[in-house]
Amino acid sequence: MKLLHISDLHIGKRIYGYDLEDDQRFILKEIIDIINDEKPDAVLIAGDIYDRADPSASAVRIFDDFLSMLASTGTESFIIYGNHDSGHRVAYGSRLFDRAGIHFSPVYDREPQCTVLEDEYGPVNIYMLPYLRSVDAEEALGSIEVDKSQRNVIVSHQFVTSAVLGDSEEMNVGTLDNISGSCYSAFDYAALGHIHMPQTIARSRADADSTSDPEDSKEEAAGQCVIRYSGSPLAYSFSESDRIHKSVTIVQLKEKGSVEVQTIDLSPLHKMRTIKGTFSDLIKDEGLVEKCRKDYIKVILTDDAGVMDAMNRLQKVFDNVMTLEYEYMRQQAEEVLIEEIHTEGAPGDLFESFYEEQHPGKEMSGYQKDLMDKVIRKIWEGQEACDEAD
């Protein structure tokens, strides 16, 4: 049985104020083309359909168009909600969608949904478990009665311990949101979402785990549960853009215990690139300008001082400069933060020191200090309210 696995669409997401609707429509159409070419028996979409629990009308239209194209392929599809989604919104109309072969995980009610598909090797049980808090996810996974003599697949949206994170994932402090890969040991393949870097975590029945290189294009596992993050179809941070190939995951299930994983690379409408150099060198480099003109750009200037109106001038050369940083300011900020954190100063003192390092010979005004104090108080009040709610 051939499965196509994707996740973390984050429809409606913006980066540095840039609307990505055209990029998302483009990549979703590319995924539909791959589905038509590969003809999988099922498509697995492992959560974070939207970037917000209350998606915009335009984001909903994009997903609606994608679902229409998906239904037209005639492929059975299994979709769960992630931590960015509202379960009620994503599951709306699910009984009608079932008739078109598109199956949404309902709002979790302690009973993970299971659908049985058949091929020449027998049944494949496909379970859907939407995003849950780690303690609830572990309980839910432990309660599923799995027939281990058959092939079992689960679509899930969790953070498995030892997964490699990128900058675009939201991280919880510590390991409170982690679950062990051993929770998936009853399954042959775990189609996961939540982590944006594609990677495979192979978990043996004996509970020995390893994390593969995210760049691996083909892995095989026999007698193991293969835990796989397909990754997001688009790069949502510059740290992902230069070293990670975005892809869809193709899974081949043959006889019990035989799982083969391959990837098909995706080509985005706009690449995300980081370019670095002096202002003068960057705008005069004709080869660089030609190569990057249409891309989404992060510029790191290595000039010793600020350049007048640098952002506007760069945007006249490169169409989509998203953000601009100065290397010397980053280095100064890092040095200040490291030094001051070691002294365990109060937040206000740390901020004043940071300000003075960035503006040599100039102190914060009384108004700025008052404003800073108000912001710090609001942060602490919000934290205390969260602690009381917990």
Regions found by a protein language model. Give the residues of each.
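Binuclear metal-dependent phosphoesterase catalytic core
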Residues: 111-120, 206-220, 229-295
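Short, surface-exposed amphipathic charged segments that create phosphate/polyanion-binding patches used
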Residues: 117-125, 244, 335-345
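Glycine-rich phosphate-binding loop signature in dinucleotide/nucleotide-binding domains
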Residues: 35-39, 120, 146-149, 291-292
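N-terminal active-site segment of His-dependent metallophosphoesterases
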Residues: 1-66, 154, 369, 373-378, ...
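Accessory, non-catalytic peripheral segments of nucleic-acid enzymes
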Residues: 37, 42, 252-390
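General small-molecule cofactor/ligand-binding pocket signal
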Residues: 4, 103-105, 127, 228, ...
